[in-house]
Amino acid sequence: MSVHIELPRELRPLMKKPLGILYRGKGRDTIEKFAGELSSPTKLISVGDVTTFHLLEAGIIPDICIVDDRTKRKPVSSDVSVRNRDKVYEEVSVDNPAGIITDELIRTLCEAFASEKLLRIFVRGEEDLATLPVILLAPPGSVVLYGQPDEGVVFVEVTEKKKEEIRALFEKLISKNQNNELDKIRRILDGHKDN
C-alpha cells in the first residue's frame, strides 16, 4: 500500500507563493532572463511541462525533468508533449495523484538523484507538488525550475537554508495528515542516500 502526504486545504495558499525567485514573463524570453545564472549547477531539475519545453527549446538540458503532459489541469499541446520526450532522456513513470506526494514519487526522485543519467520522470496524475521533495532531495548547488501559472518561472537555488525552509513546510504537511505511516516518508527524506 502506498503512503502519501495530502495537501490540506488550509495549506494550499502556501503553495501559491514562489519558493524562489520569480522571473516574470512567458516562453523562451523568460528562460533567457535567468539562463546566465545557470553556470554549471550540481543538478538542474525542471518541474512542469511548459517550463521543461521552453528550457529544451532554449538548448538548456535539465538533468531531471518531471512532467505529466498537462498544464493548468489540461492536456499540453502535441508540440510540448513531443519536445519533452527528447531522446536524450531515459524515461521513468510514477503514479502520483493530484494534491498528493506519494512515497513512490519520493523513492523515484531518490533514484534519479543517485543516477548520472538524464531522466524524464513522467507522472501519471500530477507533478505540481513534486517541487517540494525535489528541493529536499537535490544536492546543494542544484537549481530547480518550475512554472508559476500565468506569472513566469520560479528559480530555486538549493542551499541548506532552502532545504530547512522546505523541511519546515513538510513537517506542517505531515502533522496535518496525522498518519503514523508518514514516518516512512520522513525516513526516506532523511536518509535517502541509504535507499
From Swiss-Prot:
The keyword Iron-sulfur does not apply. InterPro entries: GTP-dep_dephospho-CoA_kin (IPR007164). Its EC number is 2.7.1.237. Keywords: Coenzyme A biosynthesis, GTP-binding, Kinase, Nucleotide-binding, Transferase. One of its GO terms (biological process) is coenzyme A biosynthetic process. Pathway: Cofactor biosynthesis; coenzyme A biosynthesis. GTP binds at residues 49-50, 68, 127, 150. It holds the Pfam family DUF359. The keyword Magnesium does not apply. It catalyses: 3'-dephospho-CoA + GTP = GDP + CoA + H(+). GO terms for molecular function: GTP binding; kinase activity. It is an enzyme of class 2 (transferase). Belongs to the GTP-dependent DPCK family. Catalyzes the GTP-dependent phosphorylation of the 3'-hydroxyl group of dephosphocoenzyme A to form coenzyme A (CoA). This is GTP-dependent dephospho-CoA kinase. It comes from Methanosarcina mazei (strain ATCC BAA-159 / DSM 3647 / Goe1 / Go1 / JCM 11833 / OCM 88) (Methanosarcina frisia).
